[in-house]
Amino acid sequence: MPRLPRALRFGPNMEVLSDFQELWYPESIIDSDVKYPLYTFRGSIGGSFFDSYGTNNIVREIRRTPHCATVPIASSGLRPCTSVWYDPTSLLFRIPEMRAEWDNGMGDAGDIVYKDFLFSTPAPKEFDFSNSLAPRYSNAFSAFNAKYGVIIGEGHETLKYFALLLRRLHKAVRAVRHGDLRGLRKILDSYNKGRWKPATAGNLWLEFRYGLTPLFHDIKSVMDDWNRINDKIQKLRRFSVGHGEDFKLSIDGLYPGLTHFRLSGEITVQRRHRWGITYANREGYATFDNGSIRPVSDWKELANAFINPGEVAWELTPYSFIVDWFINVGDIIEQQKQWYQNIDIVDGYQRRDIRMRSVSLKGVRNGIPVRVTGSVELVDSFYNRSHTTRIPQATLAIDTSFSSIKHVMDSISLITQRIKR
């Protein structure tokens, strides 16, 4: 019998199958091979030429998985998701070629070219962006586009607001048609009880953002629900979302071969998190259950998920949208209590990795800046992909940064509104 590559096995009819135990739970191996043990530097200092080398004193240790082969699954024709990781103790960088030039006077002039110089930084691999991914899963697999519980809860105020908009629009059209600028001014002044003040612009912005825009979205969502074709064909689909954020690493105290010459700078890396699943639609509806989608048939549980009283209560709480800027309460309530499409997740993965975005290098010679040109490449990065059949779950987190210019404008409008009072 021929020997198969790692992670493959023979089936009962001698067909070649994937060994899922090996693919999903592989054993690690430690890689500590030395790369680029030496670096070279050549050039001149003070008129003296030299050609020398130095030792890259880097301790390299990577915990990684061995290469595994896969074959497509007969029932779907898709290759299975596998667990793979490449986990170094630190990020390893290489300067393929760098040139340092200076002329500080008093005979202190130099022109040096370095090749294959290595340095390392701590690996910022403890990150998880599930809170950014979870809302996108909630939206993608929600049974309905519209939030009917919230629409019902806000129904009375919505009708009053809609009637007010129609009256204002009718009066404004009449004023423009008849060239009545004074009448149009009165309509605008009605936002602030007769006099135009700076706060009026803020009132108009808030009314547009949290009155008119959600109303149009609700109308569109209801229409989408009515027009949706409920496709329950038993075929596999794929879905994935990702999120990335920049992270800055400082470089300092690097002395490549020469005394009184120091390298420093900053490297920007991007930490990325992606979550993907392979699934099939099933009949019925479901709810969220600790990272999984659980089918539901009990009418009381279905009614509770349809109305989602927790989300309704939160949406009707004054200024809850401001809390959601900083604490993801709304995302958690929406994910855990809403009504989902019933799907069967047959395969999936979550992947975290680090990529280099940009680098800036600076040189210092005897306390004086030195012109440095060259490139940097990432030799050992971080990569972790693990098999899963769950979906990302939102957990309580605090975010003190404004995520968009709209939040800044909302804040200015609210502040001017409070000052006016």
Curated annotation (Swiss-Prot):
Primary subcellular site in the record, as a coarse category: virion
The keyword Nucleotide-binding belongs to this UniProt entry's keyword annotation: no
Localization of this protein: Virion
Keyword line: Cytolysis, Host cell lysis by virus, Host-virus interaction, RNA-binding, Viral attachment to host adhesion receptor, Viral attachment to host cell, Viral attachment to host cell pilus, Viral release from host cell, Virion, Virus entry into host cell
GO biological process: adhesion receptor-mediated virion attachment to host cell; killing of cells of another organism; virion attachment to host cell pilus
Segments of this protein annotated with the region RNA-binding: 159-177, 227-237, 295-299
Family per record: Belongs to the Leviviricetes maturation protein family.
Quaternary structure and interacting proteins, as annotated: Interacts with host MurA; this interaction inhibits the first step in host cell wall synthesis. Interacts with the capsid protein dimers.
Summary of the function given for this chain in its UniProt record: Induces host cell lysis. Inhibits host MurA activity thereby blocking the synthesis of murein precursors necessary for the host cell wall biosynthesis. May be responsible for the attachment to the host pilus.
Protein name as annotated: Maturation protein A2
Species whose genome carries this gene: Qbeta virus (strain MX1)
Gene coding for it: A
